[in-house]
Structure formats: structure tokens, C-alpha cells
């Protein structure tokens, strides 16, 4: 209970601070501008940026326009039949077993433009897995974890220069899977997905920086996220797992501006650290840390201005102390705006 209060207060304070900055009186020109000007936003929205699905493994860097809503159904799966050892190595060097893991993790993500600079979101999920480990088989289907998300964009890209957009990302993970008595999958993670990966069934507070630059016909996005893993409890004792770092680097090549058809090359990494931000020694989980490096080719296109689709498959290319897996995935966006016209983020 203390942990959830702490995280809830942290998220509330961040939202309150950034909303106050939005509503405050204009800041003198010689001071630092906490948000882009109306002229900068207008210039950006008139530049090349065709409506399309966008990245699969990353939330859009630029925020929703005020009053615009998106709801996304995301189906992410995992097929893992070999494992990496204690040294970082390529997928070709992974060894069969000892865990064979098959997972499907559907989620529904919603995001809404509170202002032209702040976007609020939430994500709920389910998780099913089938696994064999050392001859023992397990399977489970249940609720996944719930994420509360806020994005704040203090800098918007300038089409006339090299300046990119810069967005601050905050995510609070609530362990609804644990509250619903869902069983943890081997390794303690659901499949790598659109949101920064966190440990299944545990509180987590993620802070991240995201950036994007459009260079017709290419869009380039990158991000880094740090997740603080809250202390857990087992048999009346506190447990401490390592914090987690996620990174993304994504290239989108839009081939048809009208249909939003294009292909993506997306690089995703997940690192389990051997330390914690609070300084506690690690006494649970993978104490030696782990690394997963993957590359995903994907296709994206629009059925209409309201329905946007992407399909891809993430392939693990290297890893350490982790399962060597492939991750087929499908993503569908439904977009809505009170004015009837969808604006690309």
C-alpha cells in the first residue's frame, strides 16, 4: 500500500506541475520556454508528416493534438525455444532449452491530447503462456499489468533546421496481474512490446526521453527509458530486483503519402541491470543482469483516416542470460477527433 501511494503521488505531482506550466501566464521572451509556441506548432503541422500508423515498438514521440483520441489494439506474441548464456552472444550461438516459451499478450492502449503539449494514456492487457522447463510444463491465462502514461513535449521539431522533437515520458505500472493471481511467465517478462518492458506483476516507475525528426520520406525516432523496480515481498521478506533500461531506434520509410503505406526498421533493446536506483542490493531475479537486442521489420498502411494498421516481427539478434525468441505482432489504431479530421502526431 505504501508503494502504490508513493508512485501515485509521484505521478500526480508530475501531471500537476506540467499542467500548471501550461496554464501559467506567458513567460518573458528572454526566459526558457517550457512549451513550443503556436507558430512553431503551426509550422510543424504544415510540414511533411503524412498520416500513418507510425512505429510499432514505440509510442509516437510527438503528442496528440488537443482533443484527439486514439485507441490501439496490440497483439504481441513470443516464440522462444533456445537461450543465451552468461556472455553476450549472437542468436546463432544460443543453445536449445532449458526453457521453451510461447506467449500471447494482447493489450488495449488509449491516449488523449489533454493540451497541445501533454498527452495522457492508459493501457490494459491480458497474457497467456505455455512453457516447458526442465521437463515440467506450465500454462496460464490471466490479466496482465496496467500502465498509466503521461507524455510532455517541451520541444517540437523545426522543419527548417535539424532541431528534433523532444518528449518526456512517464509510466506508472500497476501489478494488476498479481492482484488477479495471474502466474508469472518464465523469465518474469511479457513479450517485448510497444510500451517499455517492465517486470510482470510488479510496481514500476519509468522515466524516459523520446526524440523524432522527419526528413522526407524518412521519419527517425529514438528513445531511452529507465524503470525503477519497486521492492517486492516474498514470505514476509523484502525482495529487490535490478532496474531495467529499454532503448529504441526506429526508421520509417513512407512510400505512399496518401495511403500511409511504408516499411519500418525498428531496433529494440532490453537490459536488466545489476543495481538499483535506491542503492539496495539485489536479492531476487537475475542478479547477473540480462540483455536482449532485437530488430523488427514492419509494414504500415491506412484503411482510412480513422483506421491505421501495422504488422511486423521482432527477431532477437543477440542476448545474454535471456531466451532467444521471435515476436510476431499486429497493431490496429482507431483515431478520433472532435473536429472530424485526424492530425498526424
For each predicted feature, which ranges?
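Outer membrane beta-barrel transmembrane domains
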Residues: 82-94, 238-345
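Transmembrane beta-barrel strands of outer-membrane/channel proteins
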Residues: 73-77, 122-126, 166-174, 222-228, ...
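Residue-level signature of outer-membrane beta-barrel architecture
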Residues: 62-64, 112, 124, 152-154, ...
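Surface-exposed strand-loop-strand hairpins of Gram-negative outer-membrane beta-barrel proteins
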Residues: 39-48, 76-105, 136, 191, ...
Amino acid at each position: 500500500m505504501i508503494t502504490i501511494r508513493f508512485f501515485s503521488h509521484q505521478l500526480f505531482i508530475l501531471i500537476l506541475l506540467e499542467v500548471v506550466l501550461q496554464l501559467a501566464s506567458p513567460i518573458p521572451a528572454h526566459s526558457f520556454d517550457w512549451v513550443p509556441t503556436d507558430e512553431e506548432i503551426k509550422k510543424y503541422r504544415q510540414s511533411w508528416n503524412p498520416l500513418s500508423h507510425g512505429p510499432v515498438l514505440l509510442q509516437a514521440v510527438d503528442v496528440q493534438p488537443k482533443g484527439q483520441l486514439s485507441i490501439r489494439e496490440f497483439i504481441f506474441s513470443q516464440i522462444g525455444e533456445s537461450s543465451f548464456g552468461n556472455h553476450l552472444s549472437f542468436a546463432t550461438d544460443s543453445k536449445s532449452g532449458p526453457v521453451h516459451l510461447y506467449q500471447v499478450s494482447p493489450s488495449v492502449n488509449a491516449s488523449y491530447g489533454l493540451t497541445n503539449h501533454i498527452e495522457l494514456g492508459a493501457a490494459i492487457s491480458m497474457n497467456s503462456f505455455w512453457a516447458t522447463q526442465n521437463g515440467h510444463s506450465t500454462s496460464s491465462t490471466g490479466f496482465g499489468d496496467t500502465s498509466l502514461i503521461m507524455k510532455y513535449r517541451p520541444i517540437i521539431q523545426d522543419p527548417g533546421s535539424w532541431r528534433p522533437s523532444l518528449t518526456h515520458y512517464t509510466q506508472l505500472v500497476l501489478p494488476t496481474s498479481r492482484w488477479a493471481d495471474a502466474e508469472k511467465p518464465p523469465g518474469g517478462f511479457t513479450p517485448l512490446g510497444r510500451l517499455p518492458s517492465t517486470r510482470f506483476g510488479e510496481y514500476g516507475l519509468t522515466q524516459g526521453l523520446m526524440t523524432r525528426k522527419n526528413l522526407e520520406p524518412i521519419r527517425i525516432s529514438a528513445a531511452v527509458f529507465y524503470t525503477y523496480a519497486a521492492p517486492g515481498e516474498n514470505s514476509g521478506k523484502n525482495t529487490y530486483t535490478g532496474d531495467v533500461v529499454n532503448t529504441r531506434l526506429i526508421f520509417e520509410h513512407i512510400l505512399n503519402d496518401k495511403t500511409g503505406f511504408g516499411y519500418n526498421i525498428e531496433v529494440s533493446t532490453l537490459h536488466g541491470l545489476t543495481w538499483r536506483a535506491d542503492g539496495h542490493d539485489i536479492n531476487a531475479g537475475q542478479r547477473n543482469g540480462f540483455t536482449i537486442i532485437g530488430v523488427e521489420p514492419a509494414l504500415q498502411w491506412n484503411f482510412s483516416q480513422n483506421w491505421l494498421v501495422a504488422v511486423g516481427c521482432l527477431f532477437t539478434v543477440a542476448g545474454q542470460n535471456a531466451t532467444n525468441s521471435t515476436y510476431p505482432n499486429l497493431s490496429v489504431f482507431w483515431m478520433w477527433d472532435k473536429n472530424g479530421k485526424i492530425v498526424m502526431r
